[in-house]
Amino acid sequence: MSWLDKLLPPKIQQTDPSTRKGIPEGLWVKCPSCESTLYRTDVEANLHVCPKCDHHMRISARARLDALLDAEGRYEIGQEIVPVDALKFKDSKKYPDRIKAAMEDTGETDAMVVMGGAIHTIPVVASCFEFEFMGGSMGSVVGERFVRGAQAALEQKVPFICFTATGGARMQESLLSLLQMAKTTAMLNQLSASKLPFISVLTDPTMGGVSASFAFLGDVVIAEPKALIGFAGPRVIEQTVREKLPEGFQRSEFLLQKGAIDMIVDRRKMRAELAQLLALLQKQPADAVA
């Protein structure tokens, strides 16, 4: 026993560290914008938007779709399609190893989830990128799921919505991933010919081959606040042109000012805003639109 232990009253003497109850991990989240420490449950209840500074954190595909679609009548499209290593690609790791790790980390089989359902009773098909799955990169599976979602919308004569959160085309699939740019765009031409709305919602980040293909082809193009949207990243552009880019370059507000997008919508208001848009585009009422 040390001299300090002798001075301390018995009730406040230190306990054995091995018997202390530790604080469970993952209870707190640090906002990357204002650096506030937030209770995870509060953040999730606020759709992963910081309650102090309104910074829109990244959110999983399923959490986003859960917040968007009516609880009843949901169904998933294309979940049976899984990636294959057709090119036997290997960089620092084998492609199948990267796929396996991404599946374990996210619980998803690829970087897109597609669901049919309704928004305030208006039938829709909605697709959403999962950024945590290999950076939301677009490969053959993502392209095929997107097309099947659009085909389902075409068959049912309902609007199609896509939430993008991606670094672009998947390099491990090389030309096969680049083919998805043409494939997805061609499918949207069929929707357009049938006078069915396609709404594109750009979230942080939307880059590369996705931004260069279908991301800006929406009848209405929406973005979340301060989302990074472009083809190449700001650092790459600065290194190429050897100039400092303007403040806020490639952010939602910059694109809105330049006319590249139609509107910026807070995530917490997205469901209501989409319902109103769909009601106008479809010329039908939406029940209980906030």
UniProtKB/Swiss-Prot annotation:
Keyword Transferase in record: yes
Textual note on the cofactor: Binds 1 zinc ion per subunit.
Any one GO cellular component localisation term in the record: acetate CoA-transferase complex
EC class: transferase
Catalytic activity: N(6)-carboxybiotinyl-L-lysyl-[protein] + acetyl-CoA = N(6)-biotinyl-L-lysyl-[protein] + malonyl-CoA
Residue positions binding Zn(2+): C31, C34, C50, C53
GO BP annotations listed: fatty acid biosynthetic process; malonyl-CoA biosynthetic process
InterPro entries: AcCoA_carboxyl_beta (IPR034733), Acetyl_CoA_COase_Trfase_b_su (IPR000438), ClpP/crotonase-like_dom_sf (IPR029045), COA_CT_N (IPR011762), Znf-ACC (IPR041010)
Gene3D superfamilies, sorted: 2-enoyl-CoA Hydratase, Chain A, domain 1 (3.90.226.10)
Compartments reported by the entry: Cytoplasm
GO MF, any single term: acetyl-CoA carboxylase activity
EC number: 2.1.3.15
Zinc finger extent (C4-type): 31-53
PROSITE patterns xref list: COA_CT_NTER
Record-annotated CoA carboxyltransferase N-terminal domain positions: 27-290
Function: Component of the acetyl coenzyme A carboxylase (ACC) complex. Biotin carboxylase (BC) catalyzes the carboxylation of biotin on its carrier protein (BCCP) and then the CO(2) group is transferred by the transcarboxylase to acetyl-CoA to form malonyl-CoA.
Protein name (Swiss-Prot/TrEMBL): Acetyl-coenzyme A carboxylase carboxyl transferase subunit beta
Source organism per UniProt: Cupriavidus taiwanensis (strain DSM 17343 / BCRC 17206 / CCUG 44338 / CIP 107171 / LMG 19424 / R1)
